[in-house]
Amino acid sequence: MKKIFTLITAVAMGVAALSSCCNKQEESKAKYIFLFIGDGMGASHIAVTESYLSAKAGKIGGEQLTMTQFPIYGTSTTHCENKTITCSAASGTAIASGHKTYYSRLGCDKDFNPLKSMAFPLKEEGYKIGIMSSVPITHATPAAFYASTPDRGDGYGIMMQIPDSGFD
């Protein structure tokens, strides 16, 4: 993955920040938290899709994807700790844990120390954790939320960490 498009992450954080500063009359715990990752998706993918939708509707521009209409919208590109171009393992780790790592490392830092993803403290707070993916759950991006290994290619080792996560 050359670029990470973390639109929904930014939107979720923005909405959380916005809702926390407005109307503090009644605070309640979020019932659901969703994180959507367009793995490998960039701004050009969105622009082409919106252009296609406009052409399909017989318009010159104007059609927007729902995600580009959110009140808070953000994008980012990333690089890993040791390369300009990142991979799904390193970028997934950065998204999941907030820490950059080396290329091909999954859920561990540059010194091979395990990094815990944001999903673990949420699980401890009582949230149910589900990881859904259009690729096998042992692939780097979804695995970054439950596994730790210096080699993203260690599918068996990654798979063996699923039960230990305690996720639902």
List each model region and its residues.
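Bacterial N-terminal signal peptides
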Residues: 8-16
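Short helix-onset patch at the extreme N-terminus, typifying the N->h transition
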Residues: 6-9, 69
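N-terminal catalytic scaffold of extracellular/periplasmic and nuclease hydrolases
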Residues: 23-168
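Positively charged n-region of N-terminal signal peptides that target proteins for export
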Residues: 1-4
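C-terminal motif of bacterial Sec signal peptides marking the signal peptidase cleavage site
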Residues: 18-20
